[in-house]
Curated annotation (Swiss-Prot):
GO CC, alphabetical: mismatch repair complex
Native species: Chlamydia caviae (strain ATCC VR-813 / DSM 19441 / 03DC25 / GPIC)
Keywords: DNA damage, DNA repair
DNA repair among keywords: yes
Record protein name field: DNA mismatch repair protein MutL
GO MF annotation list: ATP binding; ATP hydrolysis activity; ATP-dependent DNA damage sensor activity; mismatched DNA binding
Reported function: This protein is involved in the repair of mismatches in DNA. It is required for dam-dependent methyl-directed DNA mismatch repair. May act as a 'molecular matchmaker', a protein that promotes the formation of a stable complex between two or more DNA-binding proteins in an ATP-dependent manner without itself being part of a final effector complex.
Length: 580
């Protein structure tokens, strides 16, 4: 029988490091907690500075009430808070934080410096390494607090290894701060990233100005104002017009009692109101602030406090549906411009390929069916090629791999029966055709896209978050034949693009990629850009690609690039299919 370690109490540092695993996921979590502390301290000017997406350095400076050296030492202890006194206070919160876990958790996994001064007292400087106070001394400062975080996760290297790229964190950081700009008015915000000023919002700037800054002038030009409710329930904000929509829900900002939340329930209710007004697979864009009685909201669901339980959810849902429906039903001026998503050339973006179209299309070692080199006209050579002849000798044998022989039996419409040492296989020729065509595009067009220069460069206006994506991937787009240059803070010029994609669909395609960029790191995004362009060619030119089943069998059976068993089964159907 194995021996068991005795039960013992964990030390404070270990407890805080474990808590940090829940509360502090990355540098964005650190900034979120420090900014919320600043707001709870009554600050109306908050400055944030980051390096390496926050992984190198984080500095949050505020003009709040400040702390004495004694308060600083107490704040570094777990569950020390000024926000609540008993559990019932959780259901009537007027502050952003309340657990008292964040500061000690951050201190336990970083090198921290706190410089603070209360309104009636002297300033102090406290240095903490891994949760232990190293130095505490008097230091003059104006009223307020500055917290600097260096070497995040330095003593938990496993956590550090799971961090995303600085670029990904930088984009997430921007969204976090944008949400604070929108949710808390009468507060000035400043963010310096990589030693460059990202933005400076003055505290006197109103809600509409802030929405225009975050969502872009294009959104505000046709935005619909929302303001309805009374003392019990109220919703204010802006809805995007039905002509302003996005391929994902990333353009949706929801706040409950000035707290940014991820609410599938609210998003669904609003999307239902738009359901008959948007193209398929498109989502409305909006900024909405919902105010509910504090006792109706339970934010104590997740350490990040982005989830919320609503006590009278059905009532709130009906209120939102009715309000959004009324706003959308108001008479609106009709735009004389046709939106990009309604252009006939873009309808393929709304059509979902069947799963069989891409089944088994990646990870294969099949040689290309035909060398695809764009001609001077920009067309592909197989567009004018006659299909291969269909007749074939019944006893034709084809190598299926390094040591297998495949013998053709017969064809049944779209299915070819072939036999090898394992038995009879039914090959679904349409899936195989798409498979081979896609692989040809991947291998032959990775660095060979025919481009055209625009007589007048296209102007693309983007949001600040989309700007970060574009400015970081200019070289990747250039390799694909898309020349992009930055003309202003949120304005880009597209000077050339592949011949097979139109001007308006090019803009939509780029913005769709920008929406996806928040989900992956930079390396994965580079691959996604290349794959997305390949799939665009795939959608546009697949119908013109023809191949006989004999040629198809020959391609699948090339011995120098043989399939293994798992790859074969992506393209062949088993005996159950034949019986049907």
């Amino acid at each position: 029988m194995s021996s068991r370690n005795p039960i013992q109490l964990l030390d404070t540092i270990t407890i805080n490091q474990i808590a940090a695993g829940e509360v502090i996921e990355n540098s964005i979590s650190v900034v979120k907690e420090l900014v919320e502390n600043a707001l709870d301290a009554g600050a109306d000017e908050i400055e944030v500075e980051t390096l390496g997406g926050g992984q190198g350095l984080i500095v949050v400076k505020d003009n709040g009430c400040g702390m004495s050296s004694e308060d600083v030492a107490l704040a570094l202890k777990r569950h020390a808070t000024s926000k609540i006194g008993e559990f019932s206070d959780v259901f009537s919160l007027s502050s952003f934080g309340f657990r008292g876990e964040a500061l000690p958790a951050i201190a336990s996994i970083s090198k921290m410096e706190i410089l603070s001064c209360p309104r009636a007292g002297e300033g102090s400087r406290t240095i903490i390494h891994g949760g232990e106070i190293v130095t505490s001394e008097a230091k003059p400062r104006q009223v307020g607090t500055t917290i600097s975080i260096d070497s995040l996760f330095y003593n938990v290297p496993v956590r550090r290894g799971f961090q995303k790229s600085p670029q990904t964190d930088r984009m997430a950081m921007r969204k976090l701060l944008e949400n604070r700009i929108l949710s808390v008015e009468n507060v000035g915000w400043s963010w310096v990233s990589e030693r460059q000023q990202e933005f400076h919002i003055f505290k006197h700037q109103g809600f509409a100005e802030r929405v225009a800054f975050v969502m872009g002038e294009g959104f505000m030009q046709e935005a619909l104002r929302v303001d309805k409710g009374g003392n019990l329930v109220r919703v204010v904000g802006f809805l995007g017009s039905p002509g302003f929509h996005r391929p994902t829900r990333l353009g949706q900002r929801v706040f409950i009692n000035d707290r940014p939340v991820d609410s599938t329930f609210i998003s669904k209710k609003i999307s239902e109101a738009y359901s008959m007004l948007l193209p398929p697979q498109r989502y409305p864009v909006f900024v909405l602030k919902l105010y509910l009685p504090p006792e109706w909201c339970d934010f104590n669901v997740h350490p990040q406090k982005t989830e919320v339980r609503i006590l009278r959810e059905e009532f709130v849902g009906e209120f939102l549906s009715e309000t959004i429906g009324e706003v959308l039903a108001r008479p609106q001026e009709v735009s004389v411009f046709e939106t990009a998503s309604t252009l006939p050339a873009l309808r393929f973006f709304d059509e979902q390929l069947p799963e069989s179209a891409l089944e088994g299309l990646q990870g294969s070692n099949v040689l290309p069916v035909v060398k695809l080199t764009p001609s001077s006209s920009g067309s592909l050579p197989f567009l004018d090629r006659e299909p291969d002849p269909l007749p074939v000798d019944r006893q034709t044998q084809i190598s299926w791999g390094a040591s297998q022989e495949v013998r053709f039996l017969t064809s049944l419409g779209k299915i070819v029966l072939a036999e090898d040492s394992e038995g009879v296989h039914a090959i679904f020729t349409e899936s195989a055709r798409k498979h081979l065509f896609y692989l040809s595009l991947v291998e032959n067009h990775q660095h060979n896209y025919k481009s055209q220069s625009f007589l007048v460069p296209l102007c693309l206006e983007v949001t600040p978050q989309e700007r970060i994506f574009l400015s970081s991937h200019i070289e990747e787009f250039k390799l694909l034949g898309i020349e992009i240059s930055q003309m202003g803070p949120c304005v880009f010029s597209i000077e050339s693009a592949p011949t097979f994609i139109g001007e308006e669909e090019l803009k939509l395609w780029i913005l769709s990629l920008a929406a996806e960029s928040a989900k992956v790191d930079k390396r994965a995004m580079t691959l996604l850009i290349k794959e997305a362009l390949t799939q665009t060619i795939f959608c546009k030119t697949l119908r013109a690609f023809d191949i006989s089943w004999l040629s198809l069998l020959w391609q699948l059976g090339k011995p120098e690039k043989a399939f293994d068993g798992s790859q074969i089964r992506r393209l062949v159907l088993d005996e159950d299919f034949i019986k049907e």
